[in-house]
Structures are given as C-alpha cells and as structure tokens.
Amino acid sequence: MAIRKKSTKSPPVLSHEFVLQNHADIVSCVAMVFLLGLMFEITAKASIIFVTLQYNVTLPATEEQATESASLYYYGIKDLATVFFYMLVAIIIHAVIQEYMLDKINRRMHFSKTKHSKFNESGQLSAFYLFACVWGTFILISENYISDPTILWRAYPHNLMTFQMKFFYISQLAYWLHAFPELYFQKTKREDIPRQLVYIGLYLFHIAGAYLLNLNHLGLVLLVLHYFVEFLFHISRLFYFSNEKYQKGFSLWAVLFVLGRLLTLILSVLTVGFGLARAENQKLDFSTGNFNVLAVRIAVLASICITQAFMVWKFINFQLRRWREHSAFQAPAVKKKPTVTKGRSSKKGTENGVNGTLTSNVADSPRNKKEKSS
C-alpha cells in the first residue's frame, strides 16, 4: 500500500482519488442497502439471498443422535450472491484494520515506502490467518475430525455441511475475492500485480475446488494447516520490522513450512489416493455430488502436488539466493585485510552479515540497506 499524503483540498466527487480515499464508506453504503432490504416485505426475499446462507435441509432426529433435528446445507448458484455480500464486509473490515491499527503503528515507526507496504500486507494477512485458523480449528474439534481422521473420506460425498462449515467456505471465498479490488484501493505497484494475482488465484482455485467437489472435510484440514504456517511467517515479519535483529521466528517458520508441505501431501494422498479409491460408490453423479472417479482423483492430486512443488521451489530458490548473496558479500571482507582499518572493517562485516535465514524481503534486510547507501 502506498503512503497517502494528506491534502487540505478534498478531491472531486466520484473522481479517482475520491474513490480511493472513501472506498470503505462507499462499500458500507452498498452493504447497508442489502440490510435495509430485510426490513421491507417487497425486498426481503431478494435481500435475504445476499445476507443469509441458502439451500438448507432439515434432517429428522434419529435415536442415536440428539432429540432435536439437524439443519444442514448444500451449495448452489445462489451462494454467489452471499459471497458477494460478504466480500463487501471483508472490504469494510480491511479498511477498519488499516485505519485504526496499521496506520497508527506506521506513524509511530516511520517506515520507508517499501517497509510500509510490506508491513500493511503482513498486518492484514496475519489478522486474517489467525482468525481463520482459530475458526477452522474450532470446527475440526466440534465435528470430531481430530479423534477420527477417517471422516476425511468416509461417507463421501460430503454434500451436506453444517452451518459453520458452509459459512467458513463462504467467508474464505469472499475474503480472497475482496483481494482483487483491494489491488486498486491500495494502489498496488504494477510490477507487484502479477505476483498478487497468482497468489490470490491459487487460493480461490483450491478453496472453490474443495467446495464444489464436496471435499470440504479435506479442504478444511489443509487450510488450517496452511494458514497456521503462513500466520507464523507474517507475524515474524511484523516483529522483524520492529526489530531487524529478530530472526528466530523465520527459522521456526522455515522448518514448519517444510513439515506443512509434507503433511499436506500425506493427507491428500491418504484421503484421495487411498480412502476415496477404496470407496464402493465410484460413479460420477452430479445430482448427489459424487465426483469420486479416477479422472477427478488424478486431477485433484495433480493440482495439489503441483502447487506444493511450486511453493517448495520458490522457497528453496529464495533460500539459495540469500545464501549465495551472503557468501558473495563475505568473500571480499575476508580477502581485504588492511592493517590500518582492520578492526573497523571486521566490525562492518559483522554488522552487514546475514545468517541465511528467511527474512521478510531481500530489500528490507540491513545488508541491502548498506549496499543501497553505498
């Protein structure tokens, strides 16, 4: 996000700058229209599609279960309207966090433009990852996923979801869809847009795939696992911006990143490659939401494996580049040993050295600051 300069003159109404400065208020007014529509009988039927979850089914109580009937949900085309409304909510929450939390910290810390953008990105994502991780863990515990891992593939297709499960997926889709207009609202640099589009697109592809293919149980577990690792990275980057000597969080993140990729592959192969492959019903049936056929299973495993390989390749490539730059920087310091300035040069080499762990950005490290200034 670019640093906004305060001006005494207010921009013209509906101008480019006006929309950027007041986009949260504009979106709030649009969301308020849907909420006000619930108050009138004529518009209530249309507004309720946007605000509440659709496609609920009430199942009668059984002797083994509780005496009360259960209300479950499945997905449909009307979910797009619900996702749109909560996308507006995500934009509003994004603006609130930015204005009342991150901007205040930025004024105190006096970050550079590069750090300002990275700090805002990590601040927003760490808040989202923490919330989604806690929420997802609550669903896993309440629905006994931890005590019985076979629930990941047993009784497939999982076309009926609880309220918490469906609302979780609707919220995930809404959040990552809101990231597209945020690229405009936050004045993202053109060179950063392709990276952001790939980043957002991968999230939407996998979340929507798990939702539409009725693999919501597996998708929930993998999302919680991935969000926890990503939360650790972004919270470590926030601490790094406040104190550049902080590196322990990145070292722990590097270990958990590799473990997270391995667990993702193990759970995916165990669920799709073994659990669903041994299921009795392996016929494609759109009416019941059964996609347990060989072609779909191969496509699911291929997409997961390719994505994990891409993430590991980016991780290894970044680490190798950092270690190569660290070695190249230390080599001249070892060769040059002037007698007069020996103590001074060795001190500079220690200050500018990098320990090889992953930091927030190569441009943000103290060593690169030294190179830029020179």
UniProtKB/Swiss-Prot annotation:
Compositional bias per record (Basic residues), positions renumbered to this chain: 334-347
Annotated family: Belongs to the TRAM family.
PROSITE patterns with a match to the protein in the record: TLC
Positions of modified residues (Phosphoserine): S365
Subcellular location: Endoplasmic reticulum membrane
Gene Ontology BP annotations: cotranslational protein targeting to membrane; protein insertion into ER membrane; response to unfolded protein; SRP-dependent cotranslational protein targeting to membrane, translocation
GO cellular component labels: endoplasmic reticulum membrane
Pfam families given in the database record: TRAM_LAG1_CLN8
Assigned keywords, A-Z: Endoplasmic reticulum, Glycoprotein, Membrane, Phosphoprotein, Protein transport, Translocation, Transmembrane, Transmembrane helix, Transport
Subunit and interaction comment: Interacts with SEC61B. May interact with Derlin-1/DERL1.
Limits of the TLC domain: 117-326
InterPro entries in UniProt: TLC-dom, Translocation_assoc_membrane
Modification after translation: N-glycosylated.
Membrane side Cytoplasmic: residue ranges: 1-29, 98-121, 181-192, 236-251, 319-374
Lineage: superkingdom: Eukaryota
Skewed-composition ranges (Polar residues): 352-363
Name by which UniProt lists this protein: Translocating chain-associated membrane protein 1
Primary residence: endoplasmic reticulum
Lumenal side: 51-76, 143-159, 214, 273-297
Membrane spanning residue stretches: 30-50, 77-97, 122-142, 160-180, 193-213, 215-235, 252-272, 298-318
Role description: Involved in the translocation of nascent protein chains into or through the endoplasmic reticulum (ER) membrane by facilitating the proper chain positioning at the SEC61 channel. Regulates the exposure of nascent secretory protein chain to the cytosol during translocation into the ER. May affect the phospholipid bilayer in the vicinity of the lateral gate of the SEC61 channel, thereby facilitating ER protein transport. Intimately associates with transmembrane (TM) domain of nascent membrane proteins during the entire integration process into the ER membrane.
Glycosylated residues (UniProt): N56
Residue ranges of the region described as Disordered: 334-374
Membrane topology, from the record: Multi-pass membrane protein
